[in-house]
Amino acid sequence: MPIAVITARGEDAAELSAVAAATFPLACPPTVAAEDIAAFIAADLSAQRFGDYLADPDRVVLAAREDGRIIGYAILIRGDGGDQTVELSKMYVLPSRHRSGAAAALMRSGIAWASDHGAAMLWLGVNQNNQRAQRFYRKHGFEMAGTRTFRLGTGTEDDFVMVRPL
């Protein structure tokens, strides 16, 4: 069955949270403590938090569905006020569905959403050790633009900032 990307709804929060809990650890460097990963998932990727994300008018949660179940998701956040940028805050696909086209479908839908909402630029942060994600983002037109730090539990991770003009 083909992969469909939809705008997620409130009733998807629990399933999105389950996908997030299964996929977020895969993007973390091996040096990150399991307790820090678990704390991040509990604080930022719970069903309740997804409910908050889904209710936020400045965010969209896109869900990739296959055979009626969510296999991946992306969260995009509009910039404040006159800021014409959109952040691709999160984008993950279940490992069993890597290379299925789900990530590319989510990216196309995310780019279209950002463009449709007046953004001139899409940006994201990606861990400096996550070569696979960096290759994927470059393939979709993103370029390195700088660095940032990302707080993960008791540690701080170094991210590259990548941008894509729309």
Show which residues each predicted segment covers.
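C-terminal "cap" of GNAT-fold acetyltransferases
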Residues: 9-11, 86, 120-134, 138-166
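Acetyl-CoA-dependent GNAT
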Residues: 3, 7-13, 17-98, 104-113, ...
